[in-house]
Amino acid sequence: MKKIKFIVASIAVCMGITAQAQETKSAEPKGKAIVQTFGNFNADFSKDGDSHGFELERAYLGYEYKLDGGLSVKTVMDIGKSSDVSDLQRIAYVKNALVQWKQGKWTVNGGMISTTQFNFQEKFWGYRYVLKSFQDLYKFGSSADLGISAAYKATDWLSADAIIVNGEGYKKVQKGTGLCYGLGATLTPVKGLQVRLYGGLNQGATADANTLNTAAFVGYKADAFSLGAEYNYMDKAGSKQSGYSAYATVNVADNTNLYARWDEVFAGNTVSDPLRPSGSSPLKRDSAAAIVGAQFKVGKYIKVAPNVRMQMDRKAGNNTYEGYVSWYFGL
């Protein structure tokens, strides 16, 4: 009997040690490297165009580390083009340097964080390495900034978020005369259908120098395809700009997608502007763009996306046609 009790006690102790070891292992911090590179080969097929060549658009290098208690830290460097220097040069910026706390229905971010103005639309579009999303491409706002954000998932079909940042973007982190405030809501009324609403105010030195942003998005995603459309409006100190973007993806095979997108931009000005004088209509067609292409996944880390682009300048009446082979490498 004593031997049996000893054996049972030994097994119980071993099970306790094993369970404790498993619990300790699951609670151990986990980290991962962030490595992403965007590039392409492009050629201009326009009437007077003769440019062609390889281009390294952007590289992201960083690290993310998950701690216990729902905490994680993330730092990412963005090496890419800048309007401050020659197109042949590349500059490194801190794109993310943040702490995230995630617990239950709450997610809170602080530091150099991703903004909420068009992050949802960019993920739905899904081809950031090929072409920026509408608001990013036409300078409606910045994709990252210094500040804090909080999101709350009220139900399975409704979540809300708020953000307060400097309003200068991640390339100009100094504080200005005001802050940028944003409120958003995301709805999923039925499976696959997604609706996103956003409104933001970027304070200027005076009330008439403020920038107002509003955005609405509707998208549907299924296993075989996805469809999305967004409308965006910006009033920057009286200079108004708006536009919409519609895009679609069809999954034709496990590693092959077809995609297309159409952008339309409208611009106007309430003040004197010789290029866009005020008329009966405050917003006039300014430009449009179209892109059609395919994406091929080569293994786990590489994507290749040949595509054709057309840009239409309504003001000048010129069209440009370009061919691209975009590529992505990421861990």
Per-region residue spans from a language model:
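Short helix-to-loop capping/linker segments positioned immediately adjacent to catalytic or ligand/cofactor-binding
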Residues: 169-173, 183-184, 198-199, 203-206
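Short, electropositive, low-hydrophobicity segments enriched in small/polar residues
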Residues: 115, 171, 297
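Cleavable N-terminal export/targeting peptides
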Residues: 1-26
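Outer-membrane beta-barrel pore domains
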Residues: 26-29, 34, 38-50, 85-89, ...
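Outer membrane beta-barrel
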Residues: 23-167, 177-179, 186-193, 247, ...
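Short, contiguous, pocket-lining structural segments
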Residues: 142, 173-180, 206-213, 217
